[in-house]
């Protein structure tokens, strides 16, 4: 096992020096605007120095959003990702961006949460100044915004996949493809398609209740994910592309764990579809959204 772990492996057009990979996760080390700052750069560089051959930066949003994750939506952000790629390449470590659409920030949920925070701060200042009336006023605003934001948050996560228009889905697909183009320009080696969240929800018979070409049969429910893959390959043809494939598993008591993904039998069929569409690698994961 150890000898295999340290052997090189070819995936798509990339050769990894070994099989040690750092999987995607949200570190919280990014700057407030989602940029890759000194703390993020140092964290990932240490992993590369330690011998890791492949690092996937998790939850990179291709749009401006309040989501506390990395972001790459503007040409001006390319340079910071180039610095990251250059730093990791110095240690013969490849780097990928895991792209996802922050569906829980649909139509300004994040803005409502931020405005609630501001009102809360104003309430605290008024209270400290013994201005009871102003404190109560701002606290009421804070409470109402918070309640409304989280009600909308719950609705969006549960229903956006079914309610989104084809135009919305097309815009999201295009933003992901353009993000991949920017990543390629920055010298990033690969793209991981986040198959959980929005894409997993579209694939899921538990969450997808659409009646158009994106709902119903397995072919329809997986159509959008395959369109996203094709859009990325067209926008960034030199990049290796992998897919995070979430599996809905069955608990010992018979209940299901996860909703945004596919049950095992459908997942096998979808993996074959991905292979036929030209995917380079599949990362199998537990469905958890």
Model regions and ranges:
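Flavin-dependent oxidoreductase catalytic cores
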Residues: 1-289
